[in-house]
Amino acid sequence: MENTLEKKWVEDIEYLKEELKKRHNNLFAYTAEESFNEKIENLKSMVNDLDYEEMKVEISRVVASLKDAHTSLIFPAKRFIPLKFYYFNEGVYIINTCKGYEKLLFKKVLALGDMKIEEVLEELSNIISFENEYFFKAQSMKYMQIAEVLYGLLIIDNMDKIKITLDEGEYEVSTCSFEDLVYTNERLPMYAKNDSENLWFEVLESGELYIKYNSCREQGEESIGKKIENILCLIEKKNIEKVTVDLRNNLGGDSTLFTPLIDYLKNSEKINKKENLKVIIGRETFSSALLNAYTFKNSTNAKIIGEPSGGKPNCYGEILRLTLPNSKLVITYSTRFYKLIEDDLVMALYPEEVLLESIEDYINL
């Protein structure tokens, strides 16, 4: 084989196989090594027949077959559908739009290209790394927005314009760059506001303190530690007795950043009561945010409400990255096993009170 594109892809695939085996904490915890090796060899034999977008999808398929939600291809994407999707119990709906597509807001999605939405989701389930259905519901909506993913899966044949069938008609949508992905609907549920801020808080009219924790990562000049100090000062100053901590959209980072707040709430006699302290979890509560949720569950009297978590309690995590030498595609992989509970078959943290949002709830919030 000459130094061709084919040879470079084969080198990358072989590198992926060998390096994951070397570096991952326990690569074959959920799938057989023979099955993985077979998928690798199959992919090598296909390189001549696949274009770049299809190769990305097929590498993602191999990595997703390991069934470790922390081990995945970071999908390089340049073209996006200018619509934000959400997977409700009633189906997939558009919950936000970019300029020019406002009339599609809150419509139900029936098909992309010529493929029914149920089949699109089935295709996506084979290339996304997830451990439970709740995380898939979250991740699939992000992948569904990426034109390169849909093209690589042969769902569409044009990455610039995409046909989308809604419950009241068919539309052609032009894709856009990430920079142009600016949503226009400002009538959002409170939890969906300030979604780019790692930690924010607000005293509600009822006097309850609402704390939204979106990311266990530092951001900007004000540290999470400083923000927590401000929260504690506010609680003392206003003599707050009821607190809701919302972790529903937190995909993780460093679980220790939130410890000072959890410790304070744990030691507060007036707040640390089931009727006064609530923690909201959901399909995007994952990794370090799930560790925080379990700390609340195990060391406070908080009532856990919301949807089951996207993260599995016992899981592999603490990710590092490897870069394929030729294509420069990046794959995350797990370096540590977290055992939070005895029963490894429990797939999520299940709330005491399940709150499943319908499209009507979302519109009327």
What are these regions (language model features)?
Residues 1-242:
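Flexible, low-complexity junctional segments that flank or bridge functional domains
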